[in-house]
Amino acid sequence: MRNFFIALFSPLAPRLRRVHPNVLTLFSLLAGILAGISFALTGLAPLFFLVGGGFVALSGMGDSLDGIVARAHGRTSRTGDFLDHFADRLVDVAILAGLAFSRGAHAALGFILIVLALLHSYLGTQIEATLGRRSYAGTGKAELFVAFIAFTIPAYFLSAWYLRVGQHRLAFADLFMLALVLGTAISLVQRFRRGLQACMRADGGDR
């Protein structure tokens, strides 16, 4: 999915020659924060689900374009990479926290999801620090953004719907978070296993 978005947005790079990649990173961050705020406001009006989905799309576009523009115009830098990764984590937390406080949602599920998402991202960074190459194994941010955008449409129409499980009521957002928790947990295990195997192979090759 990541490669698909790189191919999709690469034609825009020549038009953005005068835009610094860090500006696109900041744009992605601001759009992500606004997405989280929008999801948190869905208790006031379900329309904010659709607004949040729009901001998620804009955030994802900015996140793809900053690296594309940097590579296309020779503006890659350690500073840009650092800012990009930090902004990515802030966007993750903002969007997931907004979902946790969305209409009818259980905040505890959102907290679990944030922890899993940060651990998943940390593993990729740690593999890069240990082996010198970034791991994008498992579910990535591109897939997460697509899932969020797809979620917002039924969430708007099903904002008053609940699933009763015993004495508990689960909103549509809860079911979405449960699916994300399961998917992220599976991806986390896969990334850990592949990273560990890569480290063990590297250790064997050094002997």
Regions from the PLM with identified roles:
Residues 47-76, 80-81:
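Glycine-rich active-site/cofactor-binding loop and its immediate structural neighborhood
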